């Protein structure tokens, strides 16, 4: 799901396989390599382990590729 909340800010929502706190330092490192991400957070209490990203550009492909490359499942949730 990709929603623009202002001219320069996208909200991207992903289903992931990331379930554990121990993964967070690695996820932080992976996401820090993607330019334009302003904020991100997880809802691991949701069955889909939701990753929510606020970014200056639509970085969906980069996020999916980076997480998949590091062994995590990641798929964008569509509107």
Question: Language-model segments: which ranges?
Answer:
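Short amphipathic beta-strand starts and helix->beta connectors
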Residues: 1, 32-39
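Short amphipathic alpha-helix segments
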Residues: 17-35
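Short amphipathic alpha-helices in soluble, non-transmembrane regions
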Residues: 26-31, 62-71
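Conserved short beta-strand edge segments in small beta-sheet-based binding/regulatory domains
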Residues: 41-42, 71-79
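Surface-exposed aromatic
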Residues: 46-50
């Amino acid at each position: 799901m990709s929603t623009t909340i202002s001219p320069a800010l996208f909200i991207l929502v992903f289903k992931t396989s990331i379930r554990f706190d121990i993964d967070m330092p690695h996820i932080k490192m992976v996401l820090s390599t993607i330019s334009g991400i302003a904020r991100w957070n997880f809802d691991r209490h949701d069955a889909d382990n939701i990753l929510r990203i606020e970014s200056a550009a639509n970085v969906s492909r980069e996020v999916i590729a980076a997480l998949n490359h590091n062994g995590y499942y990641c798929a964008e949730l569509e509107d």
